[in-house]
Structure formats: C-alpha cells, structure tokens
C-alpha cells in the first residue's frame, strides 16, 4: 500500500483534478484506491459524492473526517474511526472532507510543541488521521491512498506530508508555482 499526498503551496494548480484522475486511472487498471480529502474546500469530495452523501456525512451522526478528529478537537479522546464512502461498483473509497477540518490546525500546532517536549500525546495527535486511514487501507487491501491537501503549509498538511510515502507537487508554468515549490523545499528541505 502506497500513500501519496498531492500538495503545492499555491492554489489553482490542479492538485484536486490530478488526484481525482490518477485515482480513477489506477482503479481502471485494477487497483483499489482510497481518496482522503484533507482540503477544507472539499472539492475532491464534491467530485466524487452527491450532495445527499455529503450532507449525511456532515450531519450529527456523520462519517466525515472532521467527525473522526472531533474527539481530539473537543478534548474528549483519541481519533474516532469513521467509515469512508464506497463508490458503488468501483474499487474506490473516499474519506469525506469537511469544512471544519481547519479547526484541527490549532490542536496540531500544540501537538508539535508536545513532540518537541517528548510528550506522547503530541505523537498520537499528529499521527491520528493517517493512522486511522492506513488501518482502513490495510484491512481492505487498498493499493493506493491518495491524499488531497489544501494550499497552505499549516500543521495539518505538514503532518500528512511527513506521514506519506511520497508527495507530488502539481504545478503550472508560472512564477507563483515556482515560488511555491521553492517554499516547500525551504520548509521540508
């Protein structure tokens, strides 16, 4: 199982579109694909799921990614396992994004500080989402986990990039894309 994050510090370069098409192409050649929509704009979720599915996932008893980390955000416990949406008749699943994912940024910032102080909670918090995602992937024989990230270098994106096997930087041939790529190298280099 390979985990690949799609990230650029600049928006509008095709991260979500590339993630979506690569996932469906992999499924066409017989691979089992799990999408993870960690961009709070939730465009990957909107590409794959109907509005009814999204509304249900965001509801009180929903299964969005925010519902998974809500116990951490509220201080009630560790990550809660949620079930991704399975696209009918396809070898494709998606952990549904949520506009509220940005609420997790503050908790992750605190967790980075806890890691520097060698506190276990910091490690549990920063690994929580990808831990749950990878557990689902392993138990369902997923070949590829494709993670769509928003265009920022916040704590959530840093945690995910560091937890993935690879990350791809989609870009367009312009000065701002180049600058964004240089910024990524500065942060992760």
Question: For each of these PLM feature ranges, what is it?
Answer:
Residues 1-189:
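P-loop NTP-binding core
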């Amino acid at each position: 199982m390979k985990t690949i994050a799609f990230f650029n510090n600049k928006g509008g370069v095709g991260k979500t579109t590339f993630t979506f098409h690569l996932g469906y192409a992999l499924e066409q050649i017989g691979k089992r694909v799990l999408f993870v929509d960690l961009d709070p704009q939730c465009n990957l979720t909107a590409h794959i799921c109907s509005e009814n599915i999204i509304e249900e996932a965001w509801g009180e008893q929903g299964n969005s990614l925010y519902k998974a980390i809500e116990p951490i955000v509220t201080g009630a416990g560790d990550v809660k396992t949620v079930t991704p949406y399975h696209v009918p008749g396809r070898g494709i699943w998606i952990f549904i994004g949520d506009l509220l994912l940005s609420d997790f940024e503050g908790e992750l910032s605190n967790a980075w500080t806890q890691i520097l102080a060698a506190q276990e909670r910091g490690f549990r918090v920063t690994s929580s989402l990808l831990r749950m995602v990878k557990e689902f992937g392993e138990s369902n024989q997923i070949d590829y986990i494709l993670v769509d990230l928003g265009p920022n270098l916040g704590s959530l994106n840093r945690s995910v990039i560091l937890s993935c096997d690879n990350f791809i930087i989609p870009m367009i041939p312009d000065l701002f894309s180049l600058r964004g790529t240089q910024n990524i190298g500065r942060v992760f280099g």
